[in-house]
Design a protein with these regions (language model features):
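Flexible, acidic/glycine-enriched loop-and-adjacent beta/alpha segments
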Residues: 1-34
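Non-catalytic, structured segments within soluble enzyme domains
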Residues: 30, 34-165
Length: 165
């Protein structure tokens, strides 16, 4: 959600892009914001219905009226699903890397961030590594990390705990 701090719960640009893509191509593309995912994870359900999506949009707008963006992000990070029964960044750090969140490096954080897209797929380390590179590239492109941080994190093997044990 590259415009998380700029929108008020619903990213109109992503929504229009998603609708056009879904109407004019054979592929589907989502437009959920972090705010909408918090709604789905905590307030509604995983149903893939238009009714739920509209409810998530409404809830996201309401959350932005009563919560700061950092509070919404914290709710997301504490409840996101990462596969292997790991809900939240703290549990993900423990399950995948055997560490506390505060001990994770940039490469590990990017790998966890990438896993939220499709946890079942990214349980496989090779797939998780591919997704991690995409996350790091986007972070670099948006100016969240420097050239040096990008190169170092991209070069990190980032092994899962199960590969070390």
């Amino acid at each position: 959600d590259e415009r998380f701090y700029k929108h008020k719960g619903v990213d109109v640009i992503s929504l229009v892009r998603s609708v056009l893509n879904n109407v004019f191509t054979d592929t589907t593309q989502g437009a959920s914001t972090i705010d909408m995912q918090v709604s789905k994870n905590l307030l509604t359900s995983n149903d893939k219905t238009m009714k739920r999506k509209i409810r998530d949009m409404y809830n996201a707008k309401q959350m932005n009226k009563i919560m700061t963006k950092d509070e919404i992000l914290e709710a997301y990070l504490n409840n996101m699903y990462l596969g292997k029964d790991a809900y939240g960044a703290a549990k993900g750090a423990e399950v995948y890397f055997g560490k506390k969140v505060s001990e994770l490096n940039l490469a590990e954080c990017a790998m966890l961030a990438g896993m939220t897209n499709n946890p079942a797929r990214y349980i496989d380390h090779g797939e998780a590594k591919k997704r991690q590179v995409i996350v790091l590239y986007k972070m670099h492109q948006l100016g969240y990390i420097t050239d040096k941080e990008y190169r170092i994190a991209k070069a990190d093997d980032t092994p899962f705990k199960s590969e070390i044990d």
